[in-house]
Amino acid sequence: MKDIPIHDKIDIISLRDAGIYDDIEETGETYEQNAIIKAKFATEKTGLPAFADDSGLEIRALNNKPGIYSARYLGEDTPYAVKMEHILAELKNKDRFACYKCAIAFVTPTGNVTTSMGILNGDIAFERSNGPYGFAYDKIFYIPDYQKTFADLPPEIKNKISHRAMALRNLFNHYVTI
């Protein structure tokens, strides 16, 4: 998220930048709940306002799977290449509509919690791209308006149109006063 321009008065540091390397267990049942868990953790550890996200890929023909379990789909240690090939095989002759969803939670040291959602609609491509950008499922997430997968879009475009960028813009434009 550090690469997405948010506001010129905000300096973003990651937990690692702050010397915090703890794993945060995502026990929520929604993107929003997981984002809140992570943001509260960061605020408790640093004493600073914090925001965190939780994101996932939802595929209509797969009953919105992998969803909040996107990173753990088919097992945490399963490489994304295997996960993507599995999805492509599952979608033979099926509806390919999909969306990336992102929930952002902003938590203050006084306990105020604000959340925002961003959704980017697209399709699952028919084959995996070799695009150099992105991670996770970006090589199979196709953006019809650009006629490219997310992995084929350069960062300057992705950082404007992504589900994370939408959620951040919404959060800072409507809810957070700086």
Predicted regions: what is each one?
Residues 1-178:
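Anionic-ligand binding patches
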